[in-house]
């Protein structure tokens, strides 16, 4: 993919954006503080998200309060309460557990604070104004489609053995990723061209709490020892790069990745540097890139619209949080593998080539 990717995507986003500001938009010199609550620094992705938002908000004259909760729910609740108490006018929240924020968001509502759910839907609260994210079902479709294409299933090849991994059960996105992938894979499972060797299907059986790579590695260890003593696994659906790295460590531990035992097709998401290096080394096969610069930009546009009395959405039907359908803006994800990583990630300026040396 050429360096025009970012320009094209930005142009599409601007063209699709429904932006209706009021007659008295907030003046630049009066722009308030935006509280940004991120889940953890353990993933490079969230560090990049936070930094991108701070940079773009401050460029527009906003003050920012960026906090990381290190995947500790009480810590995130306390951070959000403090942001409200310190008069943040808008909260941008990537929730650790999207079901735990009802009370603190009521506090925000009572003080007139607007709330934007960032990439992870906040559930069970009426007090979520907007949701900025990617097309999460499509992320799963890309992952499932990559497996289908890599194995040659459309050409009638098979049967093959596959194992399924899901994301964290407390993250609404995990279900969209899984359902998107299964919308592609299930017909091949039903026809017998794909066999789930362990028989473990469904988010209640395949989820990975907190998206933890070590947890995924331990589960993969168990699957290999219990179900693959005399057969090989040909593909592993992984929803996230950190999980993929754990899966690959397990596979390498029993000899996969050698000439006599090729690595299965392993998917991923977020285009994190370790996984791109793994792709270049011939281990992980693909990932899904979500340009967080664009997500940050759309979030800033949302805040501008919220404070100006307008809206900034392109989806008003998909994301029901149990209390309301949250108006959302969905960005387009991109599949990345060894054939297009440089054009997509380096030529667009997202990474430098030196990061992969």
Swiss-Prot record:
Its main location: periplasm. Mediates chemotaxis towards D-galactose, L-arabinose and D-fucose but not towards D-fructose. Probably part of a binding-protein high affinity uptake system. CDD domains: PBP1_ChvE (cd19994). Keywords: Chemotaxis, Periplasm, Signal. Residues 1-20 form the signal peptide. The keyword Signal applies. Induction: Induced by D-galactose, L-arabinose and D-fucose. Not induced by stress conditions such as nitrogen limitation, osmotic stress, salt stress or temperature stress. SbpA from A.brasilense cannot complement an Agrobacterium chvE mutant with regard to vir gene expression. This is Multiple sugar-binding periplasmic protein SbpA. It comes from Azospirillum brasilense. InterPro entries: Bact_Solute-Bind_Prot2 (IPR050555), ChvE-like (IPR049784), Peripla_BP_I (IPR028082), SBP_2_dom (IPR025997). GO terms for molecular function: carbohydrate binding. The gene is sbpA. GO terms for biological process: chemotaxis. One of its GO terms (cellular component) is outer membrane-bounded periplasmic space. Pfam families: Peripla_BP_4 (PF13407). NCBIfam families: ChvE (NF040907).
């Amino acid at each position: 993919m050429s360096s025009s990717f970012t320009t094209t995507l930005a142009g599409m986003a601007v063209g699709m954006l429904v932006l209706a500001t009021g007659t008295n938009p907030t003046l630049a010199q009066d722009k308030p503080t935006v509280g940004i609550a991120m889940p953890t620094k353990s993933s490079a992705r969230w560090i990049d998200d936070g930094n991108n938002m701070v940079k773009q908000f401050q460029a527009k004259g906003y003050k920012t309060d960026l906090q990381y909760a290190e995947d500790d729910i009480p810590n995130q609740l306390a951070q959000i309460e403090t942001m409200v108490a310190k008069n943040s006018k808008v909260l941008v929240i990537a929730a650790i557990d999207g079901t735990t924020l009802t009370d603190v968001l009521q506090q925000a509502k009572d003080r007139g604070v607007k709330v934007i759910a960032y990439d992870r839907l906040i559930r069970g609260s009426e007090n979520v104004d907007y949701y900025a994210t990617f097309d999460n079902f499509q992320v799963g479709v890309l992952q499932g489609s990559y497996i289908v294409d890599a194995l040659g299933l459309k050409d009638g090849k098979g049967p093959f053995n596959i194992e399924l991994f899901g994301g964290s059960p407390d993250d609404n996105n995990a279900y969209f990723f899984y359902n998107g992938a299964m919308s592609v894979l299930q017909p091949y499972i039903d026809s017998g061209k794909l066999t789930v060797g362990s028989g473990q299907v469904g988010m209640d059986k395949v989820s990975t709490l907190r998206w933890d790579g070590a947890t995924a590695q331990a589960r993969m260890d168990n699957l290999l020892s219990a179900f693959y003593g005399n057969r090989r696994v040909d593909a592993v659906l992984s929803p996230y790069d950190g999980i993929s790295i754990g899966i690959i460590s397990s596979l390498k531990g029993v000899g996969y990745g050698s000439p006599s035992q090729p690595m299965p097709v392993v998917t991923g998401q977020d285009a994190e540097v370790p996984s791109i290096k793994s792709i270049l080394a011939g281990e992980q096969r693909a990932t899904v890139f979500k340009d967080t610069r664009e997500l940050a930009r759309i979030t800033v546009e949302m805040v501008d619209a919220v404070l100006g009395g307008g809206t900034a959405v392109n989806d008003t039907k998909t994301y029901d949080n149990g209390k309301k359908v949250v108006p959302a803006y969905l960005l387009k994800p991109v599949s990345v593998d060894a054939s297009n990583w440089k054009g997509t990630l380096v030529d667009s300026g997202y990474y430098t080539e030196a990061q992969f040396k």
